[in-house]
Amino acid sequence: PKGPYVCYDHFLREGSDEEILGLNNIIFKVIDKLNLLPSDGKGGYRIISNAGADGVQDVPHFHVHILGGRSLGRMVEKIN
């Protein structure tokens, strides 16, 4: 989103319904264009948004990363 949002929860709290729906629609279009939709029989994807110190957020504005095109494996070790 183009607004002054710092992270996902800030975006959900302060963003308009139109902005929130718009971002989700754009994410879907990108995933579809990248040919990653599991509902179309493709391999899938992962959406990441880092937030705060524990989330290792280095850039102080809200954005998402879309990963796909290969097996991504686990990013965080499984806790017993």
Language model: regions and residue ranges:
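HIT superfamily nucleotide-processing domains
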Residues: 1-80
